Regions:
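Membrane-proximal envelope and lipid/glycan-remodeling enzymes
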Residues: 1-319
């Protein structure tokens, strides 16, 4: 999918496409989509802006914007498309939402899990509004067909290029084509869990304390997930944990487990960049009913600390 906008840009820039600008624009449009979701959900302007900044400048997503490499383009484009899909679905536009979602899956295959969430979200909204099942299903048909068309196009392209409809080039990366090893396996989970769930950002070496450059806990790298878990716990305690919220958290956990099965989990990086794919789960959860629509003092403090740490980490990795 990232090659599509690049293809059209070649007519203007030739081989010198603005790769570094693209990754920044993808993050910016994702930020704006999150802001609109928060405002639509009833957050005040300051809190909506704060949460949007926490998802971008206060997460390991920030480090990805310094490099226009195609894998970073793919991840940020998927992030933007997924955020836009959620925004459109929340605004009762299922057809473009499902179309953008299908495009996002072409960038990050595990984003396919958001499809379950999009359908569940729309059904929940439609049924609460008293919409008949026949009307509901009718409104989902076109978007579903468009999504299937996009999936078929991806499959044909992959087959023509790699001889396999499910291969999108990942097995041709140097760490797999030359070093070998199993790309996805259950036995990768324990080591990845120790690093990317429990790992600390700093370690002590010969030169003192240094930033870990091959990953650390995704909760510290992107504290928006801390807000997600705190809100989830609050909903459980207050008995506000609905079926939709349960489905969202189930998709979140499954997505994380699938990522933890990856052998390299992103390699050299600030934080846990693969988990940036899961930020839209946190955004949607915080938009659902049951949460206060303004940030508390401790959440503002978390936001400030997160942005400061991520700016520091991003600069450190770039030097």
């Amino acid at each position: 999918m990232p090659s599509v906008p690049l293809y059209f840009l070649t007519f203007l820039f030739g081989k010198n496409t603005p790769d570094h600008l693209l990754v920044k624009l993808y993050m910016l449009f994702g930020l704006l989509a999150i802001y609109r979701m928060m405002r639509d959900a009833g957050y005040d302007k300051a809190s909506a802006a704060g949460l949007s900044l926490l998802c971008s400048f206060g997460s390991c997503l920030l480090a990805l914007t310094l490099d226009g490499a195609v894998w970073y383009q793919a991840q940020l484009l998927a992030y933007m498309l997924t955020c836009l899909a959620l925004l459109l679905m929340l605004r009762d536009h299922p057809t473009p939402a499902l179309f953008l979602y299908a495009l996002a899956v072409g960038c990050r295959p595990f984003n396919v899990l958001y499809g379950l969430l999009l359908y569940a979200l729309y059904i929940d909204m439609a049924r609460r509004d008293g919409q008949a099942w026949s009307t509901l299903l009718h409104r989902l048909i076109l978007g579903t067909l468009l999504g299937l068309f996009v999936a078929a196009a991806y499959a044909l392209y992959n087959y023509a290029r790699f001889g396999n409809p499910l291969e999108f080039g990942h097995n041709y990366l140097p760490e797999f084509s030359t070093q070998g090893g199993t790309q996805f396996a259950l036995w990768h989970i324990p080591a990845n869990f120790k690093t990317f769930v429990l790992g600390l950002p700093f370690s002590e070496g010969m030169d003192g304390w240094t930033l870990n450059q091959f990953g650390f806990s995704f909760l510290l790298a992107s504290p928006i997930f801390i807000l997600l878990l705190v809100q989830c716990a609050a909903d459980l305690c207050a008995r506000r944990f609905t079926l939709l919220k349960g489905g969202l958290m189930l998709c979140f956990i499954l997505h994380l487990l699938l990522l933890l099965m990856h052998r390299t989990f992103g390699g050299y990086q600030f934080g846990a960049r693969y988990t940036c794919d899961m930020i839209p789960y946190a955004v949607l959860y915080l938009c659902l009913p049951g949460r206060r629509r303004s940030l508390r003092v401790w959440e503002w403090c978390l936001l400030a600390a997160a942005i400061g740490f991520c700016v520091y980490g991003t600069v450190s990795m770039a030097l």
